[in-house]
Every structure is written in C-alpha cells, then in structure tokens.
C-alpha cells in the first residue's frame, strides 16, 4: 500500500506538465501583444512625443522581461519538478539548462520581478503629473517590498548554504 502511494505521488508530478505548457501559451499571447504594440506605434512614430515613445519602449522592455521570466519558469520548473529535457546534441542549448535548482530559480524570479517592477515604476514616474500622489506612494512601497523581499530571500538562501 505504501509503495502504491509513493508511486502515485511521484507520478503526480506530471500534472505540472500541462501547467508549464500553458505558460508557453501565455508567452504566445505576450508575443502577440508585443507586436500589436509595435504595429500600433509605427504609423505614429513621427508625431509621437519623445516621452510617449519612451513609455512605449519601456512597455516593450517590460514585456521582454516578463517573457524571459516565463521561459525561465517553464523550462527550469519542468526540469526541476517533472523531467529532464532531452534535447538532441546537435540542437542549440541554453547554457543554464540543468544548472538551475529551485533555490536559484527563486532568486532569478525575484530578481526578474524587481526588474519588471523597476521598469513599471519608471513608467509611472514619467507620467507622474497624471497620477495621484497617494498612488505614487503605493507604487514605491510595493516596489520596495519586492526589493526587500528579494534581498531577504538572497540572504536567507546564503545562510542556509553555509
């Protein structure tokens, strides 16, 4: 009976596979949104104010960072919790494949969230005249919460490795 439960629990890790695949569909949606933004800005490029162009570019950078985060979580999560990726030797491989454990994945996710939050905060500050001061305060507080959390996670990770 114990062996049955252990095998069933171990096999249940495959329930994560469709979730990771679903993230790839999210990446596809993000890609479509990215190009929608580009096609939206191209006809207006010469009439667009510099600050507005910078806001669009920050949005594109934001989407690129989120896309990278999705890829990292999909691939590392699959490798850590479901199965190793069997990639042909003649195919190009990402240099971090097979090297990111759940602890380093957490740190990379935290760093990515801080970077994404930083870009978002920069966009907010570029449009600060149109945003209520109390909202600005909350944007900064939320961003600092992400920063402090990332530092705390890194510190705790360092403590547990020594």
Curated annotation (Swiss-Prot):
InterPro entries: UPF0114, UPF0114_bac. It is a multi-pass membrane protein. It holds the Pfam family UPF0114. It is found in: Cell membrane. Keywords: Cell membrane, Membrane, Transmembrane, Transmembrane helix. Its main location: membrane. One of its GO terms (cellular component) is plasma membrane. The chain crosses the membrane at residues 10-32, 53-75, 134-156. It comes from the Bacteria. The keyword Transmembrane applies. Belongs to the UPF0114 family. NCBIfam families: HI0507 (TIGR00645). This is UPF0114 protein PSPTO_4583.
